């Protein structure tokens, strides 16, 4: 008997619950449809944005690959320079193509030509490519014996401490520039800082050797 009563009680509770849900749905039917529609719309928009971003990354990757391939080919096929020039004229990969052209001429020791491309690279965003261009500017200035300019470039990089670029490379460029200018004490200090902060890197090891040689010359 008690089991039957409990069974009926559960049925009544279930019926009450279902009735409450039906009443709730009827009372807030419009609001529920609006919320559901908003959720569906948001899901569609999110999916669309993800698809667009994926497509953009794919296009960007292909464009970067094209620039990289051309940069590798121009050493053997100088005629490809014209194709790289076209990519440097504008578009997604203009900065990268311009940097590759600057590198090409720097490797040929045509510092003026390299500089003519480096000045075309925008001052931002301050990403890896930006600091690669700044480093190359420092190398070109050092090769042209414009030591003050080189020191200024490398000091700016080291002061900014960018996460996008290896600080040991910038410190090494700074120390080289100071050494070339004859600022021996400053160069030794920079080499020693590099050695202390980056002992396990190539530049840290090279800095220890150069600092030792400069100490002997003093």
Language model regions located:
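Acidic, polar-rich low-complexity tracts and alpha-helical solenoid repeat scaffolds
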Residues: 1-218
């Amino acid at each position: 008997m008690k089991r039957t009563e409990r069974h009926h009680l559960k049925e009544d509770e279930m019926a009450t619950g279902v009735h409450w849900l039906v009443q709730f749905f009827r009372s807030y039917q419009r609001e529920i449809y609006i919320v559901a529609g908003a959720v569906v719309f948001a899901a569609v928009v999110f999916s669309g944005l993800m698809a667009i971003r994926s497509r953009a990354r794919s296009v960007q990757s292909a464009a970067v690959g094209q620039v990289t391939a051309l940069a590798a080919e121009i050493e053997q096929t100088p005629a490809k320079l014209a194709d790289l020039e076209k990519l440097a004229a504008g578009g997604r990969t203009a900065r990268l193509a311009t940097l590759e052209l600057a590198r090409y001429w720097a490797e040929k020791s045509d510092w003026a030509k390299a500089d003519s491309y480096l000045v075309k690279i925008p001052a931002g965003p301050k990403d890896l490519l930006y600091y690669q261009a700044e480093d190359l500017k420092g190398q070109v200035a050092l090769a042209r014996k414009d030591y003050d300019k080189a020191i200024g470039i490398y000091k700016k990089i080291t002061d900014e401490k960018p996460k996008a670029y290896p600080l040991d490379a910038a410190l090494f460029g700074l120390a080289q520039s100071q050494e070339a200018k004859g600022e021996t004490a400053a160069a030794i200090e920079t080499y020693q800082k590099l050695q202390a902060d980056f002992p396990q890197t190539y530049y840290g090891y090279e800095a220890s050797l150069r600092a030792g040689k400069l100490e002997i010359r003093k």
